[in-house]
Amino acid sequence: MWIGYPGAYGFYGVADVLNGTVSPSAYLGDVFAKNSALAPAMQNYGNIPWTNAGDFSESANVNSYLVEAEGIYTGYRYYETRYADIVLGNGGAEASAGTYANADGTVSEADGIWDYSNEVVYPFGYGLSYTTFEQTLDNVVIADDKKTAQVTVTTTNTGDVAGKSAVQVYAQTPYTDYDKQYNIEKSAVQLIDFEKTQTLEPGASETITLNIDLSNLASYDSENAKTYIVDPGTYYFAVGSNSHDALNNILASQGKTTADGMTADGNASLSYSWSWDG
């Protein structure tokens, strides 16, 4: 249990969770990797001095710089995108670069194969509870002007303890030939909205409708359009208990299974696809 710095009063809440008075309902705001030093952001990190660094004193704090070559591919956007590329057979993503461990637990060398299960301990959005929940994707309505969408989800407490759950809605945007030509960066999945339920007694349900701003699906084109763009193609919404679960649900709706390298079979009924014609 990670508690940060709760203070003296906050420890009452910690005790309530530990002794079962209340069920935990928090979720991770980042991915927990087995070795974050192998992520692109850390591999690109360095102390690169300016050629005229000697003209400045160290206290000026301007004698070196960083190149953020990883772009948007930090945190879960890196791990989930690389995983999806492996399942979809894109770009040799299974190569050993950035690999932490082989399946047998040994540290990988040149012949290692990148495996999501060996790299990620807890995905983004992961959380624990003393009870269990089941969610259904009831309805998705895309506004005629393509500016907003409504996603309706029902959450049911299927366990024996009262508790809260979060409705997490993720999105996937099409990765087009145009995107490849102009090096536009897109994550295989991105959190698009979320909301927590009220405390649900065992057997109780709650239906939540999330209002989604579709402008958040845009990507920045720095090489050609010099602005944010929305590509024509197939878009996906998915509900999941975390980023990886939601991505697996999207991949399942695309016909992928563990036979294609998925860590687990997804639930296609928790995914919704729709077309954007531009």
Locate each region found by the language model:
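Secreted, periplasmic, or luminal enzymes acting at the cell surface/secretory milieu
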Residues: 1-149, 154-164, 229-240, 246-249, ...
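Short coil/turn motifs at secondary-structure junctions
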Residues: 158-160, 174-176, 215-217, 244
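Intrinsically disordered, low-complexity Pro/Gly/Ser/Thr-rich segments with frequent PxxP/GP/PP motifs
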Residues: 167, 177-222
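Conserved aromatic beta-strand anchor motif in extracellular beta-sandwich/beta-rich domains
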Residues: 169-173
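Short glycine/proline/serine/threonine-rich loop/turn segments at secondary-structure transition edges
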Residues: 216-236
